[in-house]
Amino acid sequence: MIFVDTSFWAALGNAGDARHGTAKRLWASKPPVVMTSNHVLGETWTLLNRRCGHRAAVAAAAIRLSTVVRVEHVTADLEEQAWEWLVRHDEREYSFVDATSFAVMRKKGIQNAYAFDGDFSAAGFVEVRPE
């Protein structure tokens, strides 16, 4: 299983993004099912709506209905784990959404992510790149 971060969804949904081609190649070679979270989808909506407009955000929101994307809902317990993790890690400016993603990944035993911002690697996960 691969976890998908906002940085990947934003690159995939924005043809003007410098990593759009890389995102398309990764998506073409993805496993049968990937995972993301409701927090990541919310962040993706905001990012694409601001950068690319409403139509791009609506297209990205359709991800939640896809049969190849499993959306994990972040529980109060996972949010608390994220807050506790953030308090312990001041070596980088991690976002709360990333910290909730890390909590989901630890809960599900996921090590690999489609992510482009370096935060997942810095947190000990593997940011997958095309071969």
Swiss-Prot record:
Gene3D superfamilies for this protein: 5'-nuclease
One Pfam family linked to the record: PIN
InterPro entries: PIN-like_dom_sf, PIN_dom, VapC20-like, VapC_family
Top-level division of the source organism's lineage: Bacteria
Enzyme Commission number(s): 3.1.-.-
Activity regulation: Inhibited by EDTA.
GO terms of molecular function: magnesium ion binding; RNA endonuclease activity
Family listed: Belongs to the PINc/VapC protein family.
Role summary: Toxic component of a type II toxin-antitoxin (TA) system. An endoribonuclease that cleaves both E.coli and M.smegmatis 23S rRNA between G2661 and A2662 in the sarcin-ricin loop (SRL, E.coli 23S rRNA numbering). The SRL sequence is highly conserved and is implicated in GTP hydrolysis by EF-Tu and EF-G. Acts on purified ribosomes but not on isolated RNA in E.coli, nor on a shortened artificial substrate. Upon expression in E.coli inhibits cell growth, colony formation and translation.
Protein name: 23S rRNA-specific endonuclease VapC20
Upper lineage: Bacteria, Bacillati, Actinomycetota, Actinomycetes, Mycobacteriales
Gene this chain is encoded by: vapC20
